[in-house]
Amino acid sequence: MSEQEVTFPTMRFHKSSGLNSQVRLEGTQRSRKAGLRVCSVPWQLIVIALGILCSLRLVIVAVFVTKFFQYSQHKQEINETLNHRHNCSNMQRDFNLKEEMLTNKSIDCRPSYELLEYIKREQERWDSETKSVSDSSRDTGRGVKYWFCYGTKCYYFIMNKTTWSGCKANCQHYSVPIVKIEDEDELKFLQRHVILESYWIGLSYDKKKKEWAWIHNGQSKLDMKIKKMNFTSRGCVFLSKARIEDTDCNTPYYCICGKKLDKFPD
């Protein structure tokens, strides 16, 4: 009986130890769960805070980029405005310079304009004198229709058609050679006064020298121009209102005689 009494309390002790262990285990598990719950709350706050910070950074970056582009665009507009003003300034300066040059040119051209007006008046005077002389001309039986003088040179227009040799002979009858044109101005003057016909002039092809030569081997400032015309060496040259050209010397044309004279012949 004494052994049973001893054993029973021992068994109760073991049971109470198991209960205590179970209680402790459950308490420990509860403490861990509570600890996990307590620890999970700060991590959520950290994630939220980081999200807010990232959002703020994105907003700041977006604002910065927007401002940067606005600044770049504004700077570009300013540069364009400055360039436009610079171009306008250059254009205004060029305009002023051209205006000044035109003013100076008009001042420089004033004497030339006065000279041209003087020449025009002289031309009109000569034309009127030429007309009066032409009206007083007479027919001598050799077909002289009219004659006139310009400056110190007089011209005879023989209005019967003949060959170049015949023209030369008719001019010699008046003691005046077939006309030799001195320069471009005289050529234009004669072309302005002839009617719509062709006239022999004192230029023919010298077969011995193989070149074009004026009557009596005279010199003319038209020689270079005649060389550039590339005449076909057909013999003789005639003048019309539009051109001078070579042709067969036996072609019948009117005739122009001309010579520098001190007075009109009787």
From Swiss-Prot:
Annotated glycan sites: 87, 104
Molecular functions per Gene Ontology: carbohydrate binding
TM helices/strands, residue ranges: 45-66
Domain C-type lectin: from-to ranges: 143-261
GO CC term (a single one): cell surface
CDD domains: CLECT_NK_receptors_like (cd03593)
Disulfide bonding pattern of the chain: 149-154, 167-255, 171-257, 236-249
Protein localization: Cell membrane
GO biological processes: cell adhesion; response to virus
Listed SMART domains: CLECT
Bilayer disposition of the protein: Single-pass type II membrane protein
Segments on the Cytoplasmic face: 1-44
Record topology, Extracellular segments: 67-266
Coiled-coil annotated spans: none
Pfam families assigned to the protein according to its UniProt record, in alphabetical order: Lectin_C, Ly49
Keywords assigned: Cell adhesion, Cell membrane, Disulfide bond, Glycoprotein, Lectin, Membrane, Receptor, Signal-anchor, Transmembrane, Transmembrane helix
Function: Receptor on natural killer (NK) cells for class I MHC.
Subunit comment: Homodimer; disulfide-linked. Interacts with the adapter protein TYROBP/DAP12; the interaction leads to natural killer cell activation.
PANTHER family recorded: KILLER CELL LECTIN-LIKE RECEPTOR 2, KILLER CELL LECTIN-LIKE RECEPTOR 3-RELATED
Name this polypeptide is given: Killer cell lectin-like receptor 8
Naturally occurring in which organism (per UniProt): Mus musculus
